[in-house]
Structure formats: structure tokens, C-alpha cells
Amino acid sequence: MKLVFLFLLVTIPICCYASGSGCSILDEVIRGTINSTVTLHDYMKLVKPYVQDHFTEKAVKQFKQCFLDQTDKTLENVGVMMEAIFNSESCQQPS
């Protein structure tokens, strides 16, 4: 299950360009996702505009809880991975 959530997070930036994701809203959601000090309640307030139904809300809660269950080192590594993706050649903004 953890691998599924990780792949979900990894596929988000495929549509984005530039340093970071190039999308401030996406960057904020990713930071909230991998930040262990962001509570489930605060995270749900952050993503509320994008949660349209009860099923999505339940999935988002499980998604965040997965990250809350990880060690700080694992969360730090996810952040490093996201930066590597955003700074990769395939994610660079065209000149």
C-alpha cells in the first residue's frame, strides 16, 4: 500500500515544469504531505478545495496518514526525490 501512495505522489509532477513543480499550489500540497508537523486536520483544510466527495476525503486521509507513519528520514528522502524529479531534464521548463 505504501508503494501505491508513493507512486501516486511521484506521478503528480509529471505534468509540471520549472524549478520546484512550477505550480505553487502543488508545491504547498506536497510540502504539507511530507511534513510530519502538519496534522491530519490541518492537511484536510489545505486540500479541502480539491476534495469533492466522501470517498476522496477518505483516500486523502489515508494518504496523509501513510506519510505521518513514516520516519523523519524517510520523509526527508521523499523531499529529496521530489526535488530530483523537478530538477530532472524531463521536467525542465522550455526556454
From Swiss-Prot:
Annotated tissue distribution: Highly expressed in ventral prostate.
Induction comment from the UniProt entry of this chain: Androgen dependent, as shown by the decrease in the level of the protein following castration.
This protein's GO CC annotations: extracellular space
Keywords: Glycoprotein, Lipid-binding, Secreted, Signal, Steroid-binding
GO biological process: one example: androgen receptor signaling pathway
CDD domains attached to this UniProt entry: Secretoglobin
Nucleotidyltransferase as UniProt keyword: no
Subcellular location: Secreted
Main location: secreted
Residue positions the entry lists as glycosylated: 35
GO molecular function annotations of the record: protein-containing complex binding; steroid binding
Signal peptide: 1-18
Top-level taxon of the source organism: Eukaryota
UniProt key word Secreted: yes
Subunit details: Prostatein is composed of three different peptides called C1, C2 and C3. These form covalent C1:C3 (F) and C2:C3 (S) heterodimers whose non-covalent association forms tetrameric (C1:C3/C3:C2) prostatein molecules.
Similarity comment: family membership: Belongs to the secretoglobin family. Lipophilin subfamily.
Function: Part of prostatein which is the major secretory glycoprotein of ventral prostate gland. Steroid-binding protein; can bind non-polar steroids, cholesterol and a group of small proline-rich peptides.
Alphabetized PANTHER family for the sequence: MAMMAGLOBIN-B, MAMMAGLOBIN-RELATED
Name of the protein: Secretoglobin family 2A member 2
Organism lineage: Eukaryota, Metazoa, Chordata, Craniata, Vertebrata
